Amino acid sequence: MAQTQRSRYLKTGAIVAALLLMLLWISPSRPMHPSFPQGQPSTSAPAKGKCSKPHDPKKPLIQYALMIDAGSQGSRIHVYRFNNCGPSPELEDEVFFQTEPKKGGSGLSSYKEDAEGAAKSLDPLMEVAMKNVPDEYKSCSPIAVKATAGLRMLGPELSQKILDAVRNRLETVYPFPVVSKEKGGVEIMDGSDEGVYAWITTNYLLGKIGGPDETPTAAVFDLGGGSTQIVFQPTFPKSKSGGMPERLSEGDHKYDLQFGGRHFELYQHSHLGYGLMAARKAIHTSIIENMLASSPKDLSWLKQPIPNPCIGPEMEKNVTLEFPEGHKLAPEVQVTMVGPKVGSTAAQCRGLAEKTLNKEAACTLAPCSFNGVHQPSLEKTFAREDVYIFSYFYDRTKPLGMPDSFTLDELHQLTSTVCGGEDSWGIFAGIEGALKELRDRPEWCLDLNFMMSLLHTGYEMPLSREVKIAKKIKNRELGWCLGASLPLLSQESGWTCRIKEVS
């Protein structure tokens, strides 16, 4: 009996073993991977401390978006982490890194014919992305590169070669999905988009958009190296005669924006060639042109120190200026600009800065700000709401102790003090690093005069108008990058997860 039972157990064990062998034999040699909807990460890693599931089950709980700002003076990356715990994405974290500054700029445009070198210049930024995006999210974290005014000025042929090289390197070296060409994944960003994205960033962080309340929005003035942008939501007074109220005129300046369930009718314009570095070049060039007109035959003055009222007193600056083909000084000249020996020449510098604005240009659609560009009057259509000025506006005022909010009259006083030279700088002694900044930058007087001219003479803001400077709001970087990254969280933004089967 015991032997029969033992035989039965042996037979049963043999059958089970055979079944296991058959299952192993028919199973696939590679593991099967589930498919994921377009734009969703292939991971179920939980959010840290916010919530355990997304508000919308069609969206992933956590999303990363990468944005490279290829500016005229350098390139910067923003690595954003969002959660979808609520009806709209919430920014949880941001990592920011920029290329090392170098003479002549470290932007993509500085590489000119070396397209591959330009593409490789982004590698340090991508290393930051590789370190800060967890491996399980990399294949579903979209990246876009937006070049601004500097590359725009390089011309269509050279700039396109650089853009193609950048796309190729990102697609072949790194695991992140690159936004498609059709959706502007690697492109020279249109100036109107640049300004509007900055407006979205600012008002999103201020909590003025994206929520249920229709609160008044803030204006945004962004001063870059090659261009400056203005974006605001004008409010037109009702007609006194009882007719239809005035509206924003049709044209390229009008930007209709749908965001967070609201419609915004914005005025925007990007003034190409009116960034701070472009303004410096224009002012220095105007001085050289005046000298050339006075002495067109004898050019020995080029080797002598050239007086410049926009250089600080008893300071000098070596400047390289390029001239177009056919110009007597083409292709370039190197000169030494020197400031006055004593006293302030702020008024003279202000005059040179105002001339660059071309206020006398024909205005085909009134009213105009400068250079013949239509703009609704800020005093009439945006008199009371907040005005945020950032980028170089911030960089040239905050180090000198300006508060987060000040009037244009206070900016005018600062400009006069700075242009007065070392004898006037005693008030900066108590501000850490201010005196070193002033002594290291002979063009401080020029920079502040251009800013003052742009805001007061160009945009026609009264001296009593208050402006706010900021580099961050709620500890988040300002600029256009966040505003441009928010749309990337949508499934229709031009990318799919880069999911590969494991061999």
Swiss-Prot record:
TM region(s), chain numbering: 9-26
Entry's Gene Ontology cellular component terms: Golgi apparatus; Golgi membrane; membrane
Role according to the record: After transfer of sugars to endogenous macromolecular acceptors, the enzyme converts nucleoside diphosphates to nucleoside monophosphates which in turn exit the Golgi lumen in a coupled antiporter reaction, allowing entry of additional nucleotide sugar from the cytosol.
Xref: PROSITE patterns: GDA1_CD39_NTPASE
Entry's EC annotation: 3.6.1.42
Main location: Golgi
PANTHER family: ADENOSINE/GUANOSINE DIPHOSPHATASE, GUANOSINE-DIPHOSPHATASE
Compartments in which it is found: Golgi apparatus membrane
Protein's UniProt name: Probable guanosine-diphosphatase
Catalytic activity: GDP + H2O = GMP + phosphate + H(+)
Top-level taxon of origin: Eukaryota
Pathway assigned to this chain's UniProt record: Protein modification; protein glycosylation
UniProt keyword annotation of Membrane present: yes
Catalytic residues identified in the record: 194
Stored InterPro entries: GDA1_CD39_NTPase
Organism lineage string: Eukaryota, Fungi, Dikarya, Ascomycota, Pezizomycotina
Membrane topology: Single-pass type II membrane protein
Region of interest (Disordered), ranges: 34-55
Residues on Cytoplasmic side: 1-8
Single GO molecular function: ribonucleoside triphosphate phosphatase activity
Entry annotated with the keyword Glycoprotein: yes
